[in-house]
Design a protein with these regions (language model features):
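N-terminal secretory signal peptides that target proteins for export/translocation
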Residues: 1-11
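C-terminal motif of bacterial Sec signal peptides marking the signal peptidase cleavage site
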Residues: 23-26
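Bacterial signal peptide processing site
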Residues: 28-31
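Start-of-domain marker
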Residues: 35-70
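A cross-kingdom marker for long, charged
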Residues: 42-43, 200, 207-290
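Short, structured motif recognition centered on aromatic/hydrophobic residues
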Residues: 45, 58-59, 116-127, 135, ...
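Mid-chain, structured segments of secreted extracytoplasmic proteins
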Residues: 73-111
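Extended amphipathic alpha-helical interaction segments
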Residues: 121-240
Length: 290
């Protein structure tokens, strides 16, 4: 049901994808996805930085350690939040309730960002000039794709793309959505058009800030604890700022999701309860695996 902001920055987006999947976005094969995050994350980062053979072992180990930390430390709080959401799924949900769940989830997002920055900062500080050039080319290509998908199309095409994504996510949680419900969802989306131009500007701003960090710390040894901590805290602040959700957008999204829930039948809401129970079972099992 919820999508990451289209202006969300590189790396920070990847580190919170799991969290959103386990809160209000339906992700298929959750346990498989979760356990494969280090591998998926490595290849995703390699696509931006062309990770060298010398850098690969440290990066892979760091990603595995972040996942192990998340399993033991963060999953219990996420399971508790999912349980709270589940208790309300058979009833109407207000926008304020939805925003309340997001507010409770924010510390979990920040914890993942902070922990990932501890792992990533020393590695990113050792990128070569060639890797920065590779990064620039990758960003340019991704931005071209983004513009073609979200800025260039006509308004009707954008609405259809948003509708397709919304229905896919709704059906993963609630089961099959009727034609009448689909039309109601479309009307609701049309009433709240997404500001793609602002998202584009945010995307460029966060990319510029992140690249500025890469350039500022490129080649630094981070030989002292103080130097390493300064780099980590700087990266944490950058990612937290990028992940911050404008209040107006938050309220709009929360109400939109509450309205979608209001369109669902009792049977569909019961399906959602079962879906969330499955999430909790899977995540609890992952936590016990340690």
């Amino acid at each position: 049901m919820i999508k990451l902001s289209k202006g969300f920055p590189i790396i920070a987006k990847r580190t919170v994808t799991l969290g959103l999947c386990t809160l209000l976005v339906a992700c298929s094969a959750l346990k498989l996805l979760y356990n494969q995050l280090p591998t998926v994350g490595y290849w995703w980062l390699d696509g931006y930085f062309d990770v060298s053979d010398q850098q690969a072992p440290e990066l892979k180990r760091g990603l595995r350690e972040v996942l192990a930390w998340h399993k033991t430390t963060e999953l219990p709080a996420i399971v508790a939040l999912l349980n709270d959401v589940e208790q309300h799924l058979e009833k109407p949900i207000t926008g304020d309730q939805m925003c309340g769940w997001f507010t409770r989830f924010e510390p979990r997002i920040n914890a993942v960002l902070d922990r990932t920055a501890v792992m990533a900062a020393p590695i990113l500080a050792r990128l070569t000039p060639q890797q920065l050039t590779y990064f620039d080319k990758a960003i340019a290509e991704k931005n071209k794709e983004w513009r073609e998908k979200w800025l260039d199309p006509q308004a009707d095409d954008l609405l259809d793309a948003r509708l397709e994504r919304a229905i896919e996510n709704l059906e993963r949680v609630y089961g099959s959505v009727s034609r009448e419900q689909t039309q109601a969802v479309k009307a609701r989306l049309a009433a709240d058009p997404f500001d793609f131009e602002r998202s584009w500007q945010n995307r460029l701003r966060y990319q510029t800030a992140f690249r500025g960090w890469l350039v500022a710390y490129q080649g630094r040894a981070l030989a002292t604890p103080e130097a390493k901590q300064a780099a980590i805290q700087s990266l944490q602040g950058l990612w937290r700022a990028a992940a911050d959700w404008r209040l107006e957008d938050r309220i709009q999204t929360c109400q939109l999701l509450a309205d979608f829930h209001g369109l669902m039948t009792p049977t569909q809401r019961l399906n959602a309860v079962k879906t969330y129970q499955g999430y909790q079972k899977d995540l609890q099992s992952l936590h016990l695996e340690g």
